[in-house]
C-alpha cells in the first residue's frame, strides 16, 4: 500500500525529467481515484515539471474483474471509472494536456472514448504472457488481434478521430507486435512487460547461467 500519485510525481521530478535528453514524450500514469489528492493540483504539478501528457492507468478500476465482490465493494466506496474519465476530460479540456485513455473491457473502452475523448486510446487485452512471472493461460496472438480490432471498431463509432494502440495479452515479442500492426487497424502499440520485464529476465538469466557454467582450469 502506497501513495501511487506521490510516488509517480516524485520519481518523475527527481529521476526521469533530469535524465531526459532531446524531445522525449513523457506521460504520467495517474490514479484518478486517489482520495487524498485534488486531481487538478496533481495535473498542474505534472505541467509545472514539464509533463504534458497523462493516462488513467495508474492504476485503473477497469482492471478489476467486474463480476467480483471486490469490484462491487470498490465502486460502492466511490472508486469508479467515472473518476478516471473526469480526470482525462479535465486534463484535455481545461489544462491543454495530451490524454491517453485506457480500458480493459469493451464497455469501459467505449465509455472512456465517448466521454473523455482522449487523444490516444489504448485497449488493454489482458495481462502480458511470457517470462518468469507472466500469465500463460490467456489469449493467443490471433485472439488478441481479433479482440483488439473489435474494440477499435466500437471505439471509433463514438470517437472517430482517436489514435488507437494495442497492449497486453499475447503481445510478448517484437514479432507479436508486428502481428498486431499487420492484423489490426490501429496506429501502434504500448509495451510494458514486453520491454521492461521479459527481456531483462532473459538477459539476466542467460548471463547468470554463463557465469554459473564457468570452471577452474585443470
Language model regions located:
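Histidine/lysine/aspartate-rich catalytic loop segments that bind and position anionic ligands
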Residues: 59-86, 107-138
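Surface-exposed amphipathic alpha-helices with a cationic face
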Residues: 13-22, 47, 85-95, 145-160, ...
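Catalytic cores of alpha/beta
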Residues: 36-45, 106-116, 169-186
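Glycine-rich phosphate-binding active-site loops on the catalytic face of alpha/beta enzymes
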Residues: 49-64, 118-135, 183-207
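Alpha/beta catalytic cores of nucleotide-metabolism and tRNA/nucleoside-modifying enzymes
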Residues: 145-165, 171-218
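Hydrophobic faces of well-ordered beta-strands that scaffold small-molecule active sites
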Residues: 26-30, 54-56, 99-101, 121-123, ...
Amino acid at each position: 500500500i502506497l501513495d501511487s500519485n506521490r510516488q509517480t510525481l516524485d520519481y518523475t521530478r527527481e529521476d526521469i525529467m533530469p535524465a531526459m535528453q532531446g524531445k522525449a514524450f513523457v506521460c504520467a500514469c495517474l490514479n484518478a481515484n486517489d482520495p487524498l489528492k485534488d486531481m487538478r493540483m496533481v495535473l498542474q504539478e505534472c505541467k509545472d515539471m514539464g509533463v504534458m501528457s497523462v493516462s488513467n492507468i495508474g492504476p485503473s478500476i477497469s482492471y478489476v474483474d467486474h463480476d467480483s465482490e471486490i469490484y462491487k465493494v470498490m465502486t460502492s466506496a466511490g472508486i469508479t471509472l467515472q473518476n478516471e474519465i473526469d480526470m482525462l476530460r479535465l486534463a484535455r479540456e481545461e489544462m491543454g494536456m495530451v490524454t491517453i485513455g485506457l480500458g480493459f473491457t469493451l464497455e469501459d473502452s467505449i465509455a472512456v472514448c465517448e466521454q473523455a475523448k482522449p487523444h490516444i486510446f489504448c485497449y488493454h487485452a489482458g495481462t502480458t504472457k511470457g517470462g518468469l512471472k507472466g500469465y500463460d493461460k490467456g489469449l493467443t496472438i490471433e485472439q488478441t488481434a481479433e479482440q483488439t480490432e473489435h474494440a477499435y471498431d466500437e471505439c471509433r463509432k463514438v470517437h472517430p478521430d482517436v489514435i488507437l494502440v494495442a497492449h497486453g495479452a499475447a503481445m510478448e515479442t517484437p514479432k507479436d507486435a508486428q502481428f498486431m500492426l499487420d492484423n489490426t487497424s490501429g496506429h501502434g502499440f504500448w509495451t510494458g512487460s514486453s520491454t521492461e520485464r521479459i527481456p531483462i529476465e532473459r538477459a539476466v538469466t542467460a548471463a547468470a547461467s554463463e557465469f554459473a557454467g564457468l570452471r577452474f582450469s585443470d
